[in-house]
């Protein structure tokens, strides 16, 4: 495309377009493809029939994709906004982007800013998140310097600037992610703040937050849309942690006639929440809802839900809480919503939404409101049904969780909730190939929504293509692995593919830093030992299976060699170590690695148990950080 199109745009407009582009480009590969457009319209929650959305996307791809490579580059995106500005299609596209979380109003045109959708969206999120964080951290002595924040000012954007609140919120969502001993709480110089923000961002990444576009400087500057985007991911991970069958067997009460436990386990947390709300609504004789936006605007479903889940005082030591339904017949929507929220308050669940958020059907905040209700009062009984195979509910292994978090942190779409079920159409695997510089021909890929008939065939074709790419050009070892195995969700064989993707991703980072020199296990081990001895450390490693790694001393020493003086050796145990000592060392080592800027996905247990694959990623990430020393 010629440069002409971008010349008449002001720098501010160009920055806004870049920001908008990043919001649509979910996997951050620099291009927008049609499934990302589908996702955009789905998230924007616009009152458009499905065929209309498909029509708009088709038109955008035809008009925007000028070099016909099946995707829209940034220049083509700019062209859409300039040349197609006045068309209805472009207006709808703009509206969808403005409704997606964020803060800039595209193009700065009066029609857009007068709608004010964007600004008011994030104001509401800010208000909701501030109240949630205030409550969560009200008794934490380390946060007294910023808590409570005023939800009506910009307190939040200043409060996250030193990294402490972010670290605390990450630990509330996934306990023990960050070793408290690694958080700098005193004498907060700019350098020390930078370390806290590294720790927060790399830990957020390790629990599955997509932080590719966020840097420590963005958080220090309190950039609102980035702060809110990151906080929402952290809060959501915490809210959704228990909406999962292996952690909450009573969810099996939501099984429908003829449905297997396996089918129920494939649902996302959002789908399970909707199923849960409808289970209680059916029991109350009220109609079902299809979403947490348009269908809850009148608060009537919420009244019935609260009435169903409120404790009836029948169990030992359970206080009875009566829900007053008189507000149900209030004629004014806002007053009805306020009356409903007063009842939610009796349950200690007046969180995330204001009456206006309910009436406007804000999907994100209403989802959070319902998730919080579920966590406090699920009101489900585990079925004593004989024909349920409870052995299926083993829950994911640590390794599976690490792989899943790694994928999600790279921004794959759809979000991976269940490692095997969510990879059965290979879309996520194909996106990961792009991340490891294996080109994917997206015109060969079948994308959802799949047809009712033959859906599995379409998914299998994708899986076959994924295996084909793995053999060549990726040169993976895939002996005995076929597309059918991915499509079946075969755990061992799917893991074999996923591990090779993660390994290649890790090595690519090193090769980029080492001017393209090939990296492998021996090179990493040699670098580790050389760096340790040059820093005068007595530790060394033979290989990634070396049993001495279980003390984490080699990792701790390597961190101190990369950034001299950063380790507080008073906190590190050596000599004859108990299991607790080993675990404490490993926890400190992983957090300190993240604090000095290494994006470590492995868990402390991986070091203690010397899991060679994960140990390799730890040393490779540290080598990457070590090579960045200027």
UniProtKB/Swiss-Prot annotation:
> SUPFAM superfamilies, alphabetically?
Calponin-homology domain, CH-domain, EF-hand
Which PROSITE patterns is this protein grouped with?
Answer: ACTININ_1 (PS00019), ACTININ_2 (PS00020), CH (PS50021), EF_HAND_1 (PS00018), EF_HAND_2 (PS50222)
- Tell me the GO molecular function terms: actin filament binding; calcium ion binding; structural constituent of presynaptic actin cytoskeleton
| Modification type Phosphothreonine: residues | 391
Which residues does the record give as Ca(2+) 2 binding sites? 65, 67, 69, 71, 76
Q: Does the keyword Iron-sulfur apply?
A: no
**Which residues does the record list as Phosphoserine (modified residue)?**
268, 293, 326, 339
Task: Please provide, in alphabetical order, the Gene Ontology terms of the cellular component aspect for this entry.
Answer: cytoplasm; cytosol; neuromuscular junction; plasma membrane
| Residues reported in the UniProt entry to bind Ca(2+) 1 | 25, 27, 29, 36
- UniProt keyword list: Actin-binding, Calcium, Cytoplasm, Metal-binding, Phosphoprotein, Repeat
A GO BP annotation: bone development
Q: Where is this region: Actin-binding 1?
A: 109-382
Q: What is its main location?
A: cytoplasm
Using the record's annotation, list all stretches that form the EF-hand domain: 12-47, 52-87
Which Gene3D superfamilies does this entry report, sorted A to Z?
Calponin-like domain, EF-hand
Quote the Pfam families the UniProt record gives: CH, EF-hand_7
Q: Where is this region: Actin-binding 2?
A: 383-627
Q: Where in the cell is it found?
A: Cytoplasm
List each copy of the Calponin-homology (CH) domain by range. Answer: 123-239, 267-378, 397-506, 518-627
Function comment: Actin-bundling protein.
The record describes its quaternary structure and partners as: Monomer.
What name does this protein carry?
A: Plastin-3
Origin organism is Mus musculus (Mouse)
This protein's encoding gene: Pls3
